[in-house]
Amino acid sequence: MAEAAPARDPETDKHTEDQSPSTPLPQPAAEKNSYLYSTEITLWTVVAAIQALEKKVDSCLTRLLTLEGRTGTAEKKLADCEKTAVEFGNQLEGKWAVLGTLLQEYGLLQRRLENVENLLRNRNFWILRLPPGSKGEAPKVPVTFDDVAVYFSELEWGKLEDWQKELYKHVMRGNYETLVSLDYAISKPDILTRIERGEEPCLDRWGQEKGNEVEVGRPRMMGTGLPPYPEHLTSPLSPAQEELKEGQAPKQQQDSEARVAPAGPEAGGGVAIKTEAQSEDEMTPERLFLGVSRGQTECRIPRGPRNRPGGPSRHQAQGMPRVRAGEPRPPGASGETPRVLSRRRQRAFPCPDCGQSFRLKINLTIHQRTHVEEGRQEAPGRSPTSCGDSQAMLEPGEVVVPGPVIRWLPEEPEGRRSVAGGRALVGRRPAASKMYHCSECLRFFQQRKSLLLHQRLHTGNGQGWPACPYCGKAFRRPSDLFRHQRIHTGERPYQCPQCGRTFNRNHHLAVHMQTHARGQVGPHFPAAPARHGSLPLPWPSRKEEG
């Protein structure tokens, strides 16, 4: 059931009915203000959103412009690359054409070289004889392989060590390659052929090359199949020489004039060549190893006729020697033949033991090893130096080690000069009687302090060297450290007595004083100091520091 409605007061109801239709209720102000505020907030939010959108549009527009610029740059680079590719293609075509031309020229040059090698192998050529100069000077004769080659006998080759043999082979190959690079038309020597085949490049006991059968009594030239000294050249004196001998010509005239020998019937197509007899100091390897006597002369005998008619070749084919004006002609000589000047061999490295001269120092070093081995074989139980003398000269902690034998040439009289090389070879014995040996690099020194200074090189990173306390830089000598420290301290102990200027080194002061000496020479200072010892030396000198 519905609840009963509360009872109303009749007076209250009546009062309410009277007021409601005549007076309406007013709207509150708070609700109006809140509505206006919310509307304003909504408007500002819309404005902010519009501004953010405008910023995004501007950013997108900027990026679009940047992309357009980069696209244009890429297009330009692409166009440049296309141009470069076209130019490179054109250059490549030109280089290919040049390369083809070079290949053709190389083929022609190779064929020419093959033809020259065939001529050299067949020995179907004449040796070039250069005429003398306008002033009578000797012509420049091309270098041959025998001029720079050294040959060893079988005994000497057996005494060499393996590394010395390899060094010898390397030097011989280098000499041949050098001559070929200088455009000398020479064939490959037999010694290089044996080296390539793995054979020993030495001579047998008779002075002949191994693997070649020639007459024992007549040694032949290296690299040729002909005997170097024909019978008509090694024969006794010719009639021209006999006449000079009977006339008792001066010795100088006999030495200056060459020997002339007539062409015998055995010469064939050869030519008698006038040469000068070499002295004992100018002995060549052919004489030393092949056992040629001093009375024989060396020459080259061409074989085969010349292609050019007439001229000097016509006389040479007849075997007629050339003689000087005023000399008696040999029998059967008519006309003149070209003159061949002998080439003097300059060998500036003589051996002090046997007198043999060498053109290269390495050949002398290898040759001296043979003397050392011979000395050891002759006296195997005897050392080169006396043990008692060497032990008596040793200091505590030092030992004598075996090293290379240092040989000194004997004293020569004043004014005498060696023939080989044109230089004086006056030997001087060392001041020190023993050598100091470095165990690291096998070097020898005459003074102990030199060995101590040298051993600092093997310590590494400047260990054991005096170092600067300011910058830590290490020096080999204490005197160098003292001079270096003056850079940090600013000390200038050397003062000029003329102008008062100071220097940190003695020789700087000496150079400075020479400037004053050019203008005037005062009584208080020398014009030019003769030596550093004339000036005050507050610091120890190089000799005192050791």
From Swiss-Prot:
Give the record's keywords alphabetically.
Acetylation, Coiled coil, DNA-binding, Metal-binding, Nucleus, Repeat, Transcription, Transcription regulation, Zinc, Zinc-finger
Which terms in the GO cellular component ontology are assigned? nucleus
Coiled-coil stretches noted in the UniProt entry, renumbered to this chain: 48-124
> Which residues does the UniProt record annotate as the domain KRAB?
143-214
Task: Please give the Gene Ontology molecular function terms for this protein.
Answer: DNA binding; DNA-binding transcription factor activity; identical protein binding; zinc ion binding
For region Disordered, the annotated ranges are 1-30, 218-270, 291-344, 372-391, 527-546
Which SMART domains does the UniProt record give? KRAB, ZnF_C2H2
Q: Where is the composition biased (Basic and acidic residues)?
A: 1-18, 242-258
CDD domains, A to Z: KRAB_A-box
**Chain positions found as N-acetylalanine:** 2
Q: From which residue to which do the C2H2-type zinc fingers run?
A: 349-371, 436-458, 466-488, 494-516
The record's subcellular location field reads: Nucleus
Lineage: superkingdom: Eukaryota
Positions with biased composition (Low complexity): 302-312
This molecule's function is given as: May be involved in transcriptional regulation.
What this protein is called in its record is Zinc finger protein 783
Species name: Homo sapiens (Human)
> What's the name of its gene?
ZNF783
